[in-house]
Amino acid sequence: VSLDGTEKVHDSIRGAGSYQKTRDTILDYISGPSRKGKPAWKDIWITMTINSLNYRTVTELAQEWKDKVNKIGFQFHTPFVKGDPLWLPFGETRNEVVDCIISLKKKYPNYIVNTEKQISLMKGNWGGNGTIPIQCPSWAILCFDHRGKVKQPCCIGSSDKKGLKPICEQCGLGCYSVLVAQGIKGF
C-alpha cells in the first residue's frame, strides 16, 4: 500500500479523503479472518516515496502504522527533469531523513524494511550518470508497460524510446538500491 505521508500531506498530493479511504480499507481488511493460518495484518506492507512535500512525516507515518501492518519501507522520489520540485536534493536535509530512517530501523528492526546499507545509498548518487544506469542493476527487474512492451531504463521508465527517462544519478528507487546494497551491480 502506497502512502505519501500522514493524512494531511497525503491528501494534498493524492486528493482529499484518499488517506482515510485507504486507512479504512486496511483496517477493515485486518479486522477480518486470518489468511492461511496467519493474521491478516501480516499481509499488509506500506511504502512511502519521500519527496520535498512529505519528508517531515516519515517518523509520524511509521509510528502511526506500527502494530497495525507488518512492514513499512521507504524510497525517494526520482525526478525525470532537472529542477523537479518534488525531488529532495542530496545534502543536509536528505541526509537527516536517511539518518532518521536508520534510527527507526534500529528501534523497529522487524518493522522497517530498509537495511541501513540500502537506505544509506540514498545520501548520494549510487547508480547512474544522467539518464543512464551505470552501477544500477536495472537488468535484474524486467518491467513492462500496459501493452507488454519493455520499459527502459527501469521500472519507472517508458517503452517509448523518445519518452522521458528518469534521472538515474538522482535515483531514489528502493527496488534497485536494495540489490546494489546486496552487491548486485550493473553491467
Stretches with model-predicted labels:
Residues 147-150, 157-187:
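Radical SAM enzyme core and accessory elements
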Residues 2-151, 158-166:
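Radical SAM enzyme [4Fe-4S]-AdoMet core and its adjacent flexible, acidic
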